[in-house]
Amino acid sequence: MGDYQLTILSPQGDAWDVTERVSTLSWSGSVKRVSRQIEAVMATPNDGSLPELPCDLGNELRLSVQGAQRFLGHIVTREKATDSSTTELTGLDRGRFLSGNEGWYTFSGTAPEAAVRALCADFGIPVGSLAETGVQVARKYPGVALSKMVDSLYTMAAEQNGKRYLSRFNGAGELEVVEKPEAAALEIAPRKNLQTLRVTEDISGLQNAVAIYTDTGRLVRTVSDGESAALYGQFQHILTQRDGEDAGAEAQAWLEDNGLQQTMTVECLGDPALISGNAVLLRDNTAQAAGLCWIDADTHTWKNGQYFCRLTLNFRNLMNETAAGREIGR
């Protein structure tokens, strides 16, 4: 299985290539979770026929796929039964330091990217590229998880500029916040890499009208999807528009995020570029599911010499919208 390499490193810097001891490996992520995860089933016979593996909790895990490092994290769980010749390991990347640490911050007139860089510096979390938003925000976070702060800061930016953002850790273990793409560089198609496709359609959470009010209760205007309302009935959401602001972009984004949900579950040949947040061009007219999609969740699996992916695709470009903290002065 030479298309990947799994390495364990001790705190002292000793490194072990354990690739040949792996029977099954999965590498997964989601737009709803900042951490990517590794799960590995390792051969650890009880008869001493193989050397013991350095599977101590906290040891560093590195995964390289097709020659490029894709994951840097640590072992967080280890499981072995007395009647089993395997050990199961779970590793999480450095996103767990964002979700597992809480902070107390007040940001006023600050660009989200500057705020994120500052809080990461306080906690020693490496930072790579952070998307520039062109806006400033104000928010108080009294005892809030750092991951929620990051997503909340960029959610506020998205409400102003209409863009979509994703926070994740790259293969070097650095936090990056990227603007989600509007075009696809990857393609999934029959007779190329597509194996199976299942389509799910859902209107159980539909909201197709947004009424914009002032904070005194005066209706400013209503933004709606008339075609959806005619087909399924009207379901209304309320937005409060503050003085000097225009909630039009936020209202339009709400309609897009809460319209008819059509998701696809795809199994395809493995490609390390098929990770959550990226865009793909899906071509499969037989299931009436074709066009530009975004990956909401991904699981990459290596087993029995095979490498394949299971993806959750969405025709809507979603971000992990998060409301955290409170307004300054409250």
Language model features with spans:
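Assembly/oligomerization scaffold segments
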Residues: 1-97, 189-196
